[in-house]
Amino acid sequence: NVNTPFNNLTDLVAAAKKDPKSITAGGTFGSTSQFVFLLLEDAAGVKFKHVSYDGTKQRMTALLADNIKLGEINLAAAIKYIKAGKLKALGVTNPSRLDQIPDMKTAQEQGYNLIYAVERGVVAPKGTSKAIVDHYASMLKGAAADADFKDAMHKKGILITYKGASDYRDHFQATYDKWLPIAKKVGVYKRK
């Protein structure tokens, strides 16, 4: 939040090393909003005091009220608060800097191997015919390529990319494999 003495991830990590578990990090327990701080803990050798919230709205409210010091917030939800000086961004977990906040360094630029993004995909039930999958894939590919749509989403801080069915399946599996160790670590992975 804007009242923290940290201006970047290096400041944050130094403070966390000096006084372990003194810095509150808000997230929805068992979700990627908590996982990002667990990844940072592992990458930097620090520990935060984790505080659970039901979702982005509650986390944002807690950040703005100075009830927590850290929160993972997507750019679309946070950009107006960052630009108004009500929230302070410490780093971007995207692989590259974001056009909307071009001066904000990525976590990698700050020395932390931390790439994290909440991504959305469209899926169909198992057994859906190839013709139906291809039909929807074609529609989605067209929408993702539409300049007006991409521009409108970009202004909201939402990055649009398109992956076909096979590429998305591979990407989904790689993402699952990346998050599985963290899910096991916090006890949210249950084997059937």
Give each language-model segment a name.
Residues 39-43, 57-68, 76-84, 172:
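Short helices/loops that flank or line small-molecule/ion binding pockets
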Residues 78-147, 174-177, 191:
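C-terminal lobe and pocket-closing loops
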Residues 1-58, 105, 117-152:
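Hinge/capping helix and adjacent helix->loop/strand transition within the periplasmic-binding protein
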Residues 53, 72-74, 92, 163:
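Short beta-strand and adjacent tight-turn residues that come in two discontinuous sequence segments
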Residues 134, 145, 149-170:
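Mature extracytoplasmic/periplasmic domains
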Residues 164-192:
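Extracellular/periplasmic bilobal clamshell ligand-binding domains
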Residues 8, 52, 66-67, 74, ...:
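Conserved functional loop/turn residues at catalytic and ligand-binding sites
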Residues 19-23, 46, 64-73, 86-89, ...:
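Alpha-to-beta junction loops
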